[in-house]
Structure formats: C-alpha cells, structure tokens
C-alpha cells in the first residue's frame, strides 16, 4: 500500500462538500498529457501508454461518429467494455460524450442475474448500436442461440467488434443471431497505443467480409510488408505480413511513461530505417486487397519453415460444431522447430467423444493444411484472459513448454 502523505492526499468526503456544482472549461495545449493507461506487454511487464489532449479527442470523436454511423438524438449506443480499458476510455467516455450520445453504461457480468442480461438491456432500452468483444460473442455462442432468440432485438441496426481478430464463424453467428441477418458489422482494429479506431469497414460504404478488418479509415495510412519492409502481394496466404502505420495519426501514443528506450524498441526499432510504426500484428491482403489481421506477431508460429497464424488455426477449430472457443500457441518442438498446441472449450451440453481430438486435427488439416495440424489438443473449462478479454497466449505457451508462469498482474483470475 502507498503511505498517506499529508498535504498531498485528501479525503473525498472532505473535498466534495465544498466543491462547486459549476465547472468552467479551461484551455489546454493540444499536447497536454491526458492520461496514462497500462496495457499488457509481451514480456509480461505492463506498459504505461501516454496519450495527449488534442489529437486523442479529435480522433475518438471522428471515429465514433463515422464508424458507428452515429446519429445524435436517434441512437441508443452501448459499448460493453470496461471503462478502465482503452475501448472504455475512447468509446464510452471521450468519443460518445463529445458526440452527444445517448448511451448505456453497464458494470457487471453478462450472466448476472441470468445469461439473458445483455439481451434484456438491448430490448428494454432499444439499443441501436452494440459494440462488444469476440470473447463475449463466443461466450454467447457457447450458451446457445435460444437465449438471444427469446428477445426482441429488432432495435439493433449496427454491430461492432473490438479487441482481437474475430473468426469468421463467430462473425456469421453474431450477424445472423444477434443482428437477424440484416445489421452491418464493423470489425474494428486499433490498439491502446493508437488511441482510436484505425482500420474498419464503414457502414453503408464497405462490403464487409466475415473476419476481415477491410481497409484503413480515411486519413489513416497502413501497409502490409514483409520482413524487409517490401509490400506483400495480394492473396499470399502464409502469415508473412507485418502491419505497419507509415504516416502519423492524431491519437497516436506519445510514449511509454518513464521508459523512452522501451518505447523506441517496441514500436519503432523494427522498421527504423523507414520510420514506420510497427503495430506488433501480423496481417495479409486477400486477392481483393482487403486487409486481414492475423493477431500478434509473437502469435505467429514457425512450423517446419511455414509461418502459420494462431488466428487461422483457432478459426479452423471453432468452425467445428463442438467448439465454443480455442486458443493456439507454438511450443518448442525438436523436429519441426515449433509444434502447435491447442486449448479448446466445448460448447454447452457437448460431451467429448473418443474421436473428438482426431476429428479436430483432421478439421484443421482440411481447412488450412496438414502442416497446421495441432501436435496436441487439450480440452479445458476456461482460458486465461486479461481483464480486457484478450487470451494470454504467453501463459499458455509457458504451460505447453512446462515453464514457470510469468507476470499475471493483468489477468482476470490469476
């Protein structure tokens, strides 16, 4: 605990009684620090990301308005994120308040008091825009469609996804079951570091594809390049692309608090010669030049010289009717360099059969390639996740390789 410092620390009840109900806005420099937000790092130690006032407010307001096609006075908007996560900062607090948004703010679990909780809220308040994470969509899938089907969700006109790549199976379920087959889905790519949405379909403009991030927003410049910084060709299927941002954007991070060296090494060193920001994510362009995010580069496995994305293998596993959620890691293998180890959660009421593991391996081989067939598949009740819903593959890799677990401070349930 931090010791009390007289003169610095104040009791809430002592200050609030004398506080004025009126507030007069004060001007600040555009580069005035706005907040520091800690995000999980691949090395285990969280990074303090610094954002500043002017550019951050500009881009959160712009993206909230355009990506969600927000209409003040007509829409009821609900972003389900935790306010302490960047999505909550940008798309519950700053963006919506700037745009005069009528919104739902909910604190609690999606299954308390029952698994109908979110759908009760959508129905009761006539939610029109619903922005959530793939991990929650997969949870809804695991519970079964009979729960959303029991509700009138016809008020919904736009669905959003954030936090990690959404696999095509979950995307289709989200659109068909929650969106009744008629709502656009904006699958948004951005990071704590970028401050606001960078890559996303635009409703009414972009013909979306299940699982694809599609194109950078107007004013944003992104490329997919190989290890040498050369453009990746359209339709190259192996996970050989790196997502880089080659032009500045308003809400970009200004540094890692107290650690300029780590700031340089993490984001700028990889493509220092070109002066590009390296997002740490793998990506590919399909034959239409649409952009697909393949997850963290440290989540790209090298199997017998073939680079295979964890996101692709996870999508292949979840496409099997018995699987609600999957996480895949590359574990050291004496023969192939890395071997694929998968952890899967079964859908509700599914019992494992003697052939299930073999069936799943066959499914992956059929969907991707025999090279992508997992070496091991473990059926588990839960997956380790950060408080923002991201699967902590680093911990799964430690488990797969029999190592001691590293820093678990950002875990939901250490």
Model segments located where?
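Conserved pre-ATP/AMP-binding loop-to-beta segment of ANL
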Residues: 4-38, 45, 69-76
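Conserved S/T- and glycine-rich ATP-binding loop of Class I adenylate-forming
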Residues: 33, 39-42, 64, 77, ...
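Adenylate-forming
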Residues: 46-48, 59-67, 119, 137-144, ...
């Amino acid at each position: 605990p931090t010791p009390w410092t007289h003169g610095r620390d104040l009791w809430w009840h002592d200050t609030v009684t004398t506080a004025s109900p009126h507030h007069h806005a004060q001007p600040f420099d555009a580069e005035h620090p706005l907040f520091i937000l800690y995000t999980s790092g691949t090395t285990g130690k969280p990074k303090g990301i610094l954002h500043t006032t002017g550019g951050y407010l500009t881009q959160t307001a712009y993206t909230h308005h355009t990506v969600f096609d927000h209409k003040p006075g007509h829409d009821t908007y609900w972003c389900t994120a935790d306010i302490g996560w960047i999505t909550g900062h940008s798309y519950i607090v700053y963006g919506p308040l700037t745009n005069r948004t009528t919104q739902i703010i909910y604190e609690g679990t999606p299954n308390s008091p029952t698994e109908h909780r979110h759908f009760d809220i959508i129905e009761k308040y006539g939610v029109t825009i619903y922005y959530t994470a793939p991990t929650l969509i997969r949870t809804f899938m695991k519970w079964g469609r009979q729960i959303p089907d029991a509700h009138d969700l016809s008020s919904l006109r736009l669905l959003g996804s954030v936090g990690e790549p959404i696999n095509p199976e979950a995307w289709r379920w989200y659109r068909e079951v929650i969106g009744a087959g008629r709502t656009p889905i904006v699958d948004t790519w951005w990071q704590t570091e970028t401050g606001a949405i960078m890559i996303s379909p635009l409703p009414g403009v972009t013909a979306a594809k299940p699982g694809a991030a599609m194109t950078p927003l107007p004013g944003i410049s992104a490329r997919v390049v190989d290890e040498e910084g050369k453009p990746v060709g359209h339709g190259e299927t192996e996970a050989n692309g790196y997502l880089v941002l080659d032009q500045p954007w308003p809400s970009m991070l200004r540094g890692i608090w107290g650690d300029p060296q780590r700031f340089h090494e993490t984001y700028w060193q990889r493509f220092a010669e070109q002066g590009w920001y390296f997002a740490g994510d793998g990506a590919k362009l399909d034959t239409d030049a649409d952009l697909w995010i393949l997850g963290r580069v440290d989540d790209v496995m090298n199997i017998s010289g073939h680079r295979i994305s964890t996101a692709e293998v996870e999508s292949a596993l979840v496409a099997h009717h018995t699987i609600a959620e999957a996480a895949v890691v590359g574990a050291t293998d004496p023969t192939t360099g890395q071997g694929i180890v998968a952890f899967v959660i079964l859908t509700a009421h599914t019992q494992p059969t003697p052939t299930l593991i073999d069936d799943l391996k066959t499914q992956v081989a059929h969907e991707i390639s025999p090279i992508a067939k997992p070496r091991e598949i473990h059926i588990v009740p839960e997956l380790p996740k950060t408080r923002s819903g991201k699967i902590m593959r680093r911990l799964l890799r430690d488990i797969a390789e029999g190592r001691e677990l590293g820093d678990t401070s950002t875990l939901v349930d250490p």
